[in-house]
Amino acid sequence: TADNPQAYSQNITLFDRKRGSGESIWDIKRKIGYVSPELHLYFKEGGSCFSVVASGLFDTQGLFKRLSEEQKAKVTHWMQVMGIDHLAERSFMQISGGEQRMVLITRALVKNPELLILDEPCQGLDRVQTERLKTVLDYLAANSEMTLLYVSHYDRDIPSCVNQTLELKRL
């Protein structure tokens, strides 16, 4: 996500800008939503699920700013879309792993990223959560300019909007 040192030794173009053209890591991260299997480990302080989702608006691991009414409405909207609005006031540390994953996916979506990177997003999700995620991603693919990079070990977890695949096989 642009903060890897290897990114600086390669000829990389992100969002139509060549590396070294004046963009900061924060400029790049602002355009990327990201979820990985270990992301929940960075939220040890907990806080409410609402604040974890809201932190996605600022690319922070915690909420350090007051939200405008518009930002609050956006967080509430995305929590409803993802079916987790009932978790808003619950502590992030006190919910199940699948619920944490849904909160973090919602955090990645709340800022409407140009690039959404989901690394094993269905890990820990039940069937209902998985289907909801796939439905939301299919809708976004059809109705937005967002690019989706989706990593999964299982074909059944891949949303139908994925139109290009790369399969890595062990030799």
Regions found by a protein language model. Name each.
Residues 64-67, 91-95, 99:
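Conserved ABC ATPase signature
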Residues 105:
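Hydrophobic anchor residue at the start of the ABC signature
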Residues 116-120:
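Catalytic Walker B motif of ABC-type/P-loop ATPase nucleotide-binding domains
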Residues 5, 11-27:
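ABC ATPase NBD Q-loop/coupling interface
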